[in-house]
Regions:
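Short, glycine/charged-enriched secondary-structure capping and boundary segments
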Residues: 31-32, 52, 100-103, 138-142, ...
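Flexible beta-alpha connector loops of hexameric P-loop NTPases
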Residues: 93-103, 130, 159-162
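Residue-level signal for inorganic ion chemistry
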Residues: 73, 156, 196
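Active-site glycine-centered loops adjacent to acidic/histidine catalytic or metal-binding residues
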Residues: 89, 156, 186
Length: 210
């Protein structure tokens, strides 16, 4: 049975895949606020995007490192004639077998995107709530802070934890990651969906006109 609270956003959202870019020259021209989704390989970025959009636009895979480019999605509310947001699904990181390739890709086009993109309104760092704080995640958050990029943590797969264990995980994340806002999220139950949309809309409203 669907939760009506999670449908209030989904029914108003229309989205489409725009393009996939693995080079700066292929990025779409900045036009609307952009929301970047980042995280370790297999943390659930594509599944989270699909849950937010109420569709299956983003390809999901159990193979870590499948996303090797930045995938852009146009997002608008029903009734609006033009896109209001872009979602950017970035390549994952932190998986040993592909770490060298991913590192090269980050240096070539991901770091420049995060550093230079004028339309980037919010970076969502996805972290698996079922594992302890990781150094690679801490490094990402430090990088975003150094770049003065607005960012928040999305603690994925929270449905796998009991209430007490989830609270413990959130406390551990809060201590490890320096008080960055955290949204517990589940693609299975829809938990956190409304709160995350609130974060996105707030960032959208604060993004300078492009």
């Amino acid at each position: 049975m669907r939760n009506p609270n999670t449908e209030t956003v989904t029914m108003r959202i229309l989205a489409r895949f725009l393009l996939s870019a693995s080079d700066l020259s292929h990025f779409p021209a900045p036009s609307v606020p952009e929301i970047a989704f980042l995280g370790r390989s297999n943390v659930g970025k594509s599944s989270l995007i699909n849950t937010l959009l109420g569709s299956k636009l983003a390809r999901t895979s159990n193979t870590p490192g499948r996303t090797r480019s930045i995938n852009f999605y146009e997002v608008r509310r029903a009734g609006q004639p033009r896109p209001e947001l872009l979602f950017a699904d970035l390549p994952g990181y932190g998986y040993a077998k592909i770490s060298r390739e991913i590192s090269a890709e980050w240096a070539r086009f991901v770091n420049p995107y995060l550093h230079q993109r004028p339309s980037l309104a919010l970076c969502l760092a996805l972290i698996d709530s079922n594992i302890p704080p990781q150094e690679s995640d801490a490094q990402l958050l430090e990088f975003l802070s150094a770049q003065r990029r607005p960012h928040a943590i999305v603690a994925t797969k929270c449905d796998r934890l009991s209430g007490n264990r989830l609270q413990q995980a959130m406390r551990a994340f809060g201590q490890a990651y320096g008080g960055v806002p955290i949204v517990p999220f589940s693609t299975k139950t829809g938990a956190g969906k409304e709160e995350l949309w609130q974060q996105i809309r707030a960032a959208q409203s604060q993004c300078p006109t492009i």
